[in-house]
Curated annotation (Swiss-Prot):
Organism: Caulobacter sp. (strain K31)
GO CC entries: cytoplasm
Protein name as it appears in the record: NADPH-dependent 7-cyano-7-deazaguanine reductase
An example molecular function term from Gene Ontology annotations: preQ1 synthase activity
Residues where substrate binds: 71-73, 90-91
EC number: 1.7.1.13
Domain of life assignment: Bacteria
Record lineage: Bacteria, Pseudomonadati, Pseudomonadota, Alphaproteobacteria, Caulobacterales
Gene name as annotated: queF
Length: 151
């Protein structure tokens, strides 16, 4: 078995106070010769409005085609949790998460959908990806319906 160089998996770890202090970790991809899609879903993501300090809520869907590295899922959970006390606009949170994953894991491709619940009566959906999906990659729909409220 490949030795893993991770600091959080299997340990009791307190979430970082901010995303900039959080540690996102990677592990070797044993299937790096295959192009495939991995998906993380965070249906209860929270952050703070940078102006009012009120909580914001989102359903995040992160799709990526790993290269040589995988995102270690406990570190991702802790990284996402670090946004709970972080004030940032929806667009910034969504793109920041995608860019951090790209920085650490260097995937073949990544897209993130941030489906934010309404604040001020307006739901905001934010989408970012690194470019076209690799040829032949099966990319299923993210499965999150547009916000309809009671309509």
């Amino acid at each position: 078995m490949t030795e893993l160089h991770v600091t959080q998996l299997g340990q009791v770890v307190e979430p970082a106070a901010s995303p900039d202090q959080a540690v996102l970790e990677r592990v070797p991809n044993p299937q790096s010769d295959v192009t495939y899609l991995a998906r993380f879903v965070a249906p209860e993501f929270t952050s703070l409005c940078p102006v009012t300090g009120q909580p914001d809520f989102a359903h995040l869907v992160i799709d990526y085609a790993p290269g040589d590295w995988l995102i270690e899922s406990k570190s991702l959970k802790l990284y996402l949790t670090s946004f709970r006390s972080h004030g940032s606009f929806h667009e910034d949170c969504t793109v920041k998460i995608g860019r951090k994953i790209v920085e650490i894991a260097q995937p073949r491709w990544l897209r993130i959908g941030g489906y934010w619940y309404p604040r001020g009566g307006i739901p905001i959906d934010v989408f970012w990806q690194t470019g076209p999906a690799p040829e032949g990659l099966w990319v299923p729909d993210q499965g999150v319906a547009p916000y309809r409220g009671r309509g």
